[in-house]
Amino acid sequence: MGSKAKKRVLLPTRPAPPTVEQILEDVRGAPAEDPVFTILAPEDPPVPFRMMEDAEAPGEQLYQQSRAYVAANQRLQQAGNVLRQRCELLQRAGEDLEREVAQMKQAALPAAEAASSG
C-alpha cells in the first residue's frame, strides 16, 4: 500500500476584529428598526436616555432605571425557566431515543443471527 501525503489547504487569514470605535459607529449608524434592536426588544422598554436627561427630578430617573432593571430581571428569570424546561425536554427526548435505538438493536439482532446461520 502506498502512503498518501496529506495536502494542506491554505486558508485566507482572518481579518482583524473591529475596534470598539468601529462597533460603536456601526451601532450608532444602524436604523431603529434594525433587527439587532428589535429581535430582543423588551415588552416594556425602559425610558430612553434622552427622556431621562430631560426628566426634572433625579429621583424620577432612578425610579425609571429601577423599573427597567426589575423588568429586565424578570425577563431573565423567565428565560432561565424556559431554558430549564427545554433542557429537561431535550434530556427526556435523548433518553427516549437511546431506549428506542436499544430496542431496534434488540429486534435486529435475532434477524441478523437467523440470516447468518441460515
From Swiss-Prot:
It comes from Homo sapiens. The keyword Coiled coil applies. The lineage of its organism: Eukaryota, Metazoa, Chordata, Craniata, Vertebrata. The keyword Coiled coil applies. The modification Phosphotyrosine is found at residue 63. Residues 81-109 form a coiled coil. Belongs to the UPF0449 family. It comes from the Eukaryota. Signal peptide: none annotated. It holds the Pfam family UPF0449. InterPro entries: UPF0449 (IPR028227). This is UPF0449 protein C19orf25. Keywords: Coiled coil, Phosphoprotein.
